[in-house]
A protein has these predicted regions:
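Cysteine-dependent hydrolase recognition
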Residues: 1-415
Length: 415
């Protein structure tokens, strides 16, 4: 069994994690996931009741997503107004040992919460606080939790889509399907996160660095489903690639992509997705559609992608969703407008990462580009309905990945 909680901007990430755990064969209790504006937010007592149900075993998996510090978390009711409604690490330790039992022994816990993985030495606390100085990492280790994955810094999300820490933890949940150990699952979740980025931002590197694994990396998680022989880390096409020799381009593999584009309307504006995949989310930039194609080729290494043809249409008067990384509450996040620059500057990117099956390469395509207007924050969203591209390959021994710089281009009319 598994328990997933969340509220405010973490609710969509919690729902994504719950759905992926369910797909992996787990029975998931999602009753503590509160959508923004819920009329009955869950309390600290409700969470403790779910973690330590009377007469029943503690869930084997728990993703308790909330606002944290290193030794307490805020309930959904606390987030809604009662700031005193906390669950402390000391309370959890007491419940875990009640009646001489070890109710958290062998469990797997992970969270999107801020500083939930910050291990603070007891000597730093001192004084009267020394007796209750135990942080989450220390407390859960003493309770014999097998695995605890949490952030040493701020957990970061987005109010309009599943992004940053939310997305990483959802990927981790997906890989807890019995095909990998708990340590491998986090390793490959981070790899898959990086491999799916059309553009890498500082917040991406931050969340990858601070998501910390405590416990036994070789611990395995069993599920109710038939264990897969391999674990799929990323949603992408995986057709075999056979590069051919072009007299001008050398080894190349041509592709034509016709993404299915879907408009999403939110309180913050509009954005599009491609092929039902998560969009490209980059801090302080308009959210863009994104789709991914595996371009892994045996014995060859992709060095870049060359766009050869485009078919597009424009949507005018669009107020885009401009990504503002959220660390506190959705309401406290500043409102950001788009500027008059076009984003993204490049719509195709080759990523190289490690999957459970070995080295993987993907063509990450962002079939959209927004050009803003500074006076009211609206602008033109260009959407690419058809994209022709060639992925260029070299031998693995070739270490030159520097793209050529085009300083000038001229056009000539047809004769």
């Amino acid at each position: 069994t598994a328990l997933v909680s969340g509220y405010d901007f973490l609710s969509d990430g919690a729902l994504s994690a719950a759905e992926r755990l369910k797909t992996g064969g787990h029975t998931v209790d999602r009753s503590l996931i509160d959508e923004p504006g819920t009329s009955t937010p869950w309390t600290s007592a409700a969470l403790l009741g779910k973690l330590f149900p009377s007469g029943e075993a503690t869930p084997m998996l728990a993703s308790v997503n909330a606002h944290y510090d290193h030794q307490a978390l805020l309930s959904s009711a606390g987030d809604a107004g009662d700031g005193s409604d906390l669950v402390t690490a000391a309370q959890v330790a007491e419940k875990a040992r009640l009646g001489g039992a070890e109710k958290l022994a062998g469990r797997v816990l992970f969270t999107m919460g801020c500083h939930a993985g910050l291990a603070v030495p007891d000597a730093y606390v001192g004084g009267a606080g020394a007796a209750t100085a135990g942080d989450w990492a220390q407390t859960l280790a003493e309770a014999k939790v097998a695995v605890y994955v949490a952030n040493t810094g701020y957990g970061i999300g987005d109010s309009s889509s599943v992004a940053y820490t939310e997305r990483l933890m959802a990927l981790y949940a997906k890989l807890l399907d019995g095909s990998l150990t708990a340590g491998q699952a986090l390793t490959y979740a981070k790899q898959a996160y990086y491999g799916s980025l059309g553009a890498v931002g500082v917040y991406d590197t931050k969340i990858l660095q601070q998501s910390t694994f405590y416990g036994l990396p070789f611990w395995e998680v069993s599920t109710n489903a038939t264990q897969p022989t391999t674990s799929s880390t990323a949603a992408r096409s995986s057709a075999a690639v056979e590069p051919t020799t072009d007299p001008t381009l050398g080894l190349q593999a041509p592709f034509t992509m016709t993404p299915t584009l879907t408009e999403v309307t939110t309180d913050d504006g509009r954005f599009w997705t491609a092929d039902d995949m998560d969009p490209q989310v980059t801090h302080y930039q308009p959210t863009q559609p994104k789709t991914t194609l595996s371009v892994t080729a045996t014995g060859k290494l992709a060095h870049g992608a060359l766009i050869s043809s485009l078919t597009s249409h424009d949507v005018t008067g669009v107020r885009p969703v401009v990504t503002t990384p959220v660390v506190d509450t959705t309401a406290a996040a500043p409102s950001v407008r788009s500027d008059d620059a076009a984003w993204p500057a490049s719509i195709a990117n080759i990523t190289t990462w490690h999957s459970p099956e070995g080295l993987a390469q993907d063509l990450v395509l962002m079939p959209g580009q927004f050009t803003g207007s500074t006076h009211d924050g609206t602008g033109v969203q260009r959407l690419f309905d058809r994209v022709g591209a060639s992925v260029l390959y070299r031998d693995p021994s070739d270490t030159d990945f520097t793209a050529p710089t085009v300083t000038q281009a001229t056009g000539k009319p047809n004769a």
